[in-house]
């Protein structure tokens, strides 16, 4: 069973969304480690390392995710983790264009960025595709190493 880390980053205390996501991802066959609300970057990273997670799913609804996520990808890399990272929610105060917001978070290193109206099934299908693609890449990489 694939493990994902889920939580609300920073000072955000919105719990309903991650509860819905936790149940949806579990129903889809994932092992979900739910950090709850007001989680720090290091809590996500430590949990991903401890549970050998394949993905980190970050939620934020209070509009300050950009500040909360500065340096997150760098810390993930420094920890030596190879994880897929998603973020979703109401990520920016007064966001004019979600495309601009998406580009901001892609530049911060997130693999996928979702708005607050995204159906959980969309994120689940995206993660299955991303992890499936990743498994194929790892398998072919291992074959190359074995054949060398």
UniProtKB/Swiss-Prot annotation:
Which reaction does this chain catalyze? (2S,3S)-3-methyl-L-aspartate = L-glutamate
Keyword Transferase part of the UniProt annotation? no
Q: Which UniProt keywords apply?
A: Cobalamin, Cobalt, Isomerase, Metal-binding
Gene3D superfamilies in UniProt: Cobalamin-binding domain (3.40.50.280)
Q: What is its EC number?
A: 5.4.99.1
The segment annotated Disordered runs over 129-148
Indicate the enzyme's highest-level EC class. isomerase
Which positions bind adenosylcob(III)alamin?
11-15, 59-61, 90-94
Location of the B12-binding domain: 1-134
User: Which GO annotations describe the biological process of this protein?
Assistant: anaerobic glutamate catabolic process; glutamate catabolic process via L-citramalate
GO MF entries: cobalamin binding; metal ion binding; methylaspartate mutase activity
The UniProt entry, under InterPro entries, shows: Cobalamin-bd, Cobalamin-bd_sf, GlmS
Q: Does the keyword Isomerase apply?
A: yes
Family matches, as CDD domains: Glm_B12_BD
Task: List compositional bias (Basic and acidic residues) regions by residue number.
Answer: 129-141
Cofactor(s) the protein requires to work: adenosylcob(III)alamin
Q: Name one Pfam family in it.
A: B12-binding
Query: Could you tell me which pathway this protein works in?
Result: Amino-acid degradation; L-glutamate degradation via mesaconate pathway; acetate and pyruvate from L-glutamate: step 1/4
Q: Which family does it belong to?
A: Belongs to the methylaspartate mutase GlmS subunit family.
Oligomeric state and interaction partners are given as: Heterotetramer composed of 2 epsilon subunits (GlmE) and 2 sigma subunits (GlmS). GlmE exists as a homodimer and GlmS as a monomer.
What does this gene product do? Answer: Catalyzes the carbon skeleton rearrangement of L-glutamate to L-threo-3-methylaspartate ((2S,3S)-3-methylaspartate).
Q: What is this protein called?
A: Glutamate mutase sigma subunit 2
